[in-house]
Amino acid sequence: MTIRILAEGLAFRYGSKGPNIIHDVSFSVYDGDFIGIIGPNGGGKSTLTMLILGLLTPTFGSLKTFPSHSAGKQTHSMIGWVPQHFSYDPCFPISVKDVVLSGRLSQLSWHGKYKKKDFEAVDHALDLVGLSDHHHHCFAHLSGGQIQRVLLARALASYPEILILDEPTTNIDPDNQQRILSILKKLNRTCTILMVTHDLHHTTNYFNKVFYMNKTLTSLADTSTLTDQFCCHPYKNQEFSCSPH
């Protein structure tokens, strides 16, 4: 099995004297993994994803990403990122196509002009998320579920080898939750996925392993009893949805 991400003794804190946000975190992510990242608020889930994305630098330890030799990609373009929140001005008439096209910025040449391959990547990404007929729709007029799918398409426009998502099914209706999870399941055939979530009931069956983050990391390879285990967790009332809606 090919390693895609390797972390050893990872720790992070803000400033030289601040408390560790995470500490002693070690894990491996392999090609084809679909990993759920769970844990209480303040447990370090977001910090971990920022470290993987290269937006934060470890205070101690090491974290390495390994692109495939055939891809020839830099780290910043081998990882696609779908944030939980996307700030935009609802009065600005940006189209779905332009939002997805922004996912190609890391691929632009020095003169900064989009080429035919960039527009083809947008078409392909929108087709993957089932929005191929929404190119010219106004982004601000979409439903919550459609917005999440557009953000997923934006991440897919760079043809990433690794996809990281921060609670992509939060605050959207059950039909769109299921649609997004089904899309991710198909994408997992060719893409390694890490997904932060609080919703164990609807997502557990999609994961082949789970990372539980609460300052440090526990890797759980067997997800078959995961829901029962964490329904008894003291954070369940604030954090985890373990029963059907």
Curated annotation (Swiss-Prot):
Q: Which PROSITE patterns match?
A: ABC_TRANSPORTER_1 (PS00211), ABC_TRANSPORTER_2 (PS50893)
Binding positions for ATP per the UniProt entry = G39, P40, N41, G42, G43, G44, K45, S46
User: Coiled-coil stretches, from where to where?
Assistant: none
Q: Which UniProt keywords apply?
A: ATP-binding, Cell inner membrane, Cell membrane, Membrane, Nucleotide-binding, Transport
Gene Ontology cellular component annotations, sorted alphabetically? plasma membrane
Q: Mind telling me which SMART domains this protein's record contains?
A: AAA
Q: What does this protein do?
A: Part of an ATP-driven transport system CPn0541/CPn0542/CPn0543 for a metal. Probably responsible for energy coupling to the transport system.
**Similarity comment: family membership:** Belongs to the ABC transporter superfamily.
Full protein name:
Probable metal transport system ATP-binding protein CPn_0542/CP_0210/CPj0542/CpB0563
> What lineage, starting at the top, does this entry show?
Bacteria, Pseudomonadati, Chlamydiota, Chlamydiia, Chlamydiales
